[in-house]
Amino acid sequence: MAMLLNQAQPPQTRDGGGTQGASLGPGVPVGQQQLGLQQQQQDFDPVQRYRMLIPQLKESLQNLMKIAAQNLAQNTNIDNGQKSADGPVQRFDKSLEEFYALCDQMELCLRLAYECLSQSYDSAKHSPTLVPTATKPDAVQTESLPYTQYLSMIKSQISCAKDIHNALLECSKKIMGKTPNTQGGL
């Protein structure tokens, strides 16, 4: 994003000069910053990233099929004893790798989206209600927990997390305790 902004700013100072560039300068970078921020948010959103990859995947598949057809036609001509007048044909394996790389990216996006969704469901399941806020005393929140119940729920979640952490530490110590003995015997 910084590179995009740095590339866009020098033409403004050259075109605008002294006072005119100063009046136009602050408005344009803010718009570019907002555009850059939106692009960053889209990059982090797996669903948006997936949607952006679909046209690339279609193009890659079309290119792959075109190269496969060209290679097949060239091989057929060679098998029939005819010389190919087309010249060098693109490599099928490179376009296949490009296609698979895009498929892998899309798979990762879908897995990430699924993970985000399952975390959202788990969050709603384990903390389904909100605590009433002091900033909105007039608003009646029927599904909210009293603060004391919320505190007890959070304390139980922290206790559970500590138990899991301690169990993982014990397992790690057991594994580390066994590892030097096996290495020393080799």
UniProtKB/Swiss-Prot annotation:
One of its GO terms (biological process) is regulation of transcription by RNA polymerase II. Residues 25-41 have a biased composition (Low complexity). Residues 1-12 have a biased composition (Polar residues). Its main location: nucleus. Coiled coil: none annotated. It is found in: Nucleus. InterPro entries: Mediator_Med29_met. Residues 1-41 are annotated as: Disordered. One of its GO terms (cellular component) is mediator complex. The keyword Nucleus applies. The keyword Transcription applies. GO terms for molecular function: transcription coregulator activity. Keywords: Activator, Nucleus, Transcription, Transcription regulation. Component of the Mediator complex. Belongs to the Mediator complex subunit 29 family. This is Mediator of RNA polymerase II transcription subunit 29. It comes from Xenopus laevis.
